[in-house]
Amino acid sequence: MNKDLTVGSPSKVLWQFCLPMFGSILFQQLYNIADSLVAGKLIGENALAAVGNSYEITLIFLAFSFGCNIGGSVIVSRYFGAKDYNTMKTAVTTALIGTVVLCGALMAVGLLGCRSLLVLIRTPAELMADSAEYLDIYTLGLPFLFLYNVATGVFTALGDSRTPFLFLAGSSTANIAVDVLFVAAFDLGVAGVAWATFLCQGVSCVLSLWVVARRVRAVPSEGERVWFSWKMLGQIAVVAIPSILQQSFVSVGNIIIQSVVNSFGASVIAGFAAATKLNNVLISSLTTLGSGISNYASQNLGAGKNERVRAGFGAGVKLLGSICLCFTALYLLAGRQLLMLFMNSPTGEAINTGLTFLQTIAPFYLLLAFKLTSDGLMRGCGMMGRFMATTLSDLFLRVVLAILFSSWLGVNGIWLSWPVGWFVGTVLSMVFYRTSIHRQAEEKTTL
């Protein structure tokens, strides 16, 4: 079902639209969490460390797929909000075609270069074989990942956040079962974890594309259908490329931080891997909700309702802030119990590493509600330069401080770089929001 985000109470509209997206990303995170859970519990600590070590590299591919998602989604939602349905359909097919070409190039790079990258980040010898095998299988599944993300972007652009939720709920649940089957019954080791994700993402991708095709065909339009447009691809790229660069820089920064963590040994890597999975449940959820806020802003911008864009800030902060507070309480009160899901011992270096990481960063989660709401509104309004500036400042500080603090304070110094980077990025994002979107809407209201 398509939803018009340009009418109704901004708070109610955003909550109704974004909550299914929140459910979707929770199930999306089950893919990676299930891999680590099964690896840690059924194979061993080194397997957990190998999957976690590989995960930081897979984030580069996820950065490109997220960029394709947000680029297509923002442009499709803009034409949907403007009721220009024929051009909207051109945007959908152009996004899909462009994504296929990009994905093919990335598959070649991944299959040829991932092992070299594992060496570059100082992967311990005992983790190398499993890490490389996991990455090779993951790379083969990139078409499923990319096309599924574009399909999800189309759904959210049309105001439908429920359908992606249903797909992810089914495929994520199946992934857990297939993970256990391949590892416990077939004894495939880390490769079994990767093949389970490959299979379940493939089924989800095919089904989502089929539903998208039916949904887009059902939208009434007039005139000749254009399947691919270079001009449209350029519009999508204007939004997608900054998002790809932003996410890629974040991924590269995380890889640099991972290389610092790797110097402390397999147990620290395992603890960091488990804690990162938990942290990424929140970060990925907030990022996805931020893209929902972008769609809200883009539809209203297309409809000429700038004042509703400004009203979305308060609604977005309340939504994201409530989620941040829940996760802060959860990780501070039950961090050890959650980390135990990945490990077999309640004590030891691995679990203590993960617990210290969570206890250091969780109290600062609320900062992200303000930053990602502002970022989402700026991205939806096409202010990509400002959006990138806030993220890169955060990333730069995190990487530099992780290196410096680790040399002064040891491994625990690495974790301090997160709250410092978040604080600076949030301040910049709020300043940019106040001097752009907020001021424009305020001036329009007073005319």
Where are these regions (language model features)?
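Transmembrane alpha-helix boundary and packing residues in multipass membrane permease domains
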Residues: M21, I25, L37, V74, ...
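Small-residue-rich hydrophobic transmembrane alpha-helices
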Residues: L48-A108, L145-P164, G271-G335, L368-G382, ...
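Hydrophobic transmembrane alpha-helices of multi-pass small-molecule transporters
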Residues: I60-A63, M107, N175-V180, S204-L209, ...
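Helix-terminus/linker motif at the lipid-water interface of multi-pass membrane proteins
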Residues: L30-A49, L118-A125, L181-L188, S248-K277, ...
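Transmembrane helical elements of multi-pass membrane transporters/channels
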Residues: Q16-D35, I137, Y148, S171, ...
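Short alpha-helical transmembrane segments in multi-pass integral membrane proteins
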Residues: M1-C18, V76-G141, A185-I241, A297-P363, ...
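Short runs within selected transmembrane alpha-helices of multi-pass transporters and secretion channels
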Residues: N69, Y138-T156, P164-N175, V193-S208, ...
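N-terminal transmembrane alpha-helices
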Residues: L5-L42, E56-G71, I75, V100-M107, ...
